């Protein structure tokens, strides 16, 4: 695409907003912030990319990101894959039962859902319960060994928020609010995002 963070920044400094506004490179950037950390001036290029994405008409933004954002808005679970509250709970129970049956050392393993007063509220990326449910149990084991007081919630468990990557502030806020309100209703003190834990 002939673009990189340095060129992007140069276009912004030169006031060539028209060349930035519609350039597809902003959708190739992962907003990982490495360029910001490498920048000797500490310029937040990721924030600039976010604002450049925001200039695109919503219906012209990448369909995969747009679809995932809209899916999370359509269900109270917050899942970008559309996994319902009941399906999420079923997957947890199924994996928990399998672990207890096949791994006797883990017969006491717990994966609480909607546990009132738990200290930690744990969100979950939809990919695991949807495609790789066996990837959920290792974290449960770590939390069990550490004696952590935690819970999932049926409402707002979806930890991925594609609305942020879409640069859709209102939708981002709505998905986030759903999750945080769920954590608050349960009386949890700390929100843990699954992607940050492991």
Q: Model-found features: residue ranges?
A:
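A broadly conserved sequence feature marking short terminus-proximal activation segments
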Residues: 1-8
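Iron-sulfur-cluster electron-transfer modules
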Residues: 9-194
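Conserved small/polar residues in nucleotide/adenosyl-binding loops
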Residues: 197
């Amino acid at each position: 695409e002939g673009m990189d963070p340095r060129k992007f920044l140069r276009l912004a400094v030169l006031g060539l907003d028209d060349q930035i506004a519609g350039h597809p490179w902003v959708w190739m950037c992962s907003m990982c912030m490495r360029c910001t950390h490498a920048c000797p001036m500490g310029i937040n290029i990721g924030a600039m990319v976010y604002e450049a994405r925001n200039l695109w008409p919503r219906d012209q933004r990448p369909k995969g990101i747009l679809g995932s954002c809209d899916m999370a808005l359509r269900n109270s679970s917050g899942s970008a894959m559309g996994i319902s509250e009941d399906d999420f709970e079923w997957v947890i129970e199924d994996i928990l039962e399998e672990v207890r049956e096949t791994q006797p050392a883990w017969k006491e393993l717990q994966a609480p859902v909607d546990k009132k007063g738990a200290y930690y509220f744990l969100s979950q990326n939809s990919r695991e319960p949807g495609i790789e449910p066996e990837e959920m149990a290792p974290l449960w084991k770590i939390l069990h060994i550490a004696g952590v007081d935690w819970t999932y919630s049926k409402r707002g468990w979806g930890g991925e928020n594609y609305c942020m990557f879409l640069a859709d502030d209102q939708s981002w806020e709505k998905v986030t609010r759903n999750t945080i309100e769920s954590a608050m209703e349960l009386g949890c003190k700390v929100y843990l995002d699954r992607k940050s834990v492991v």
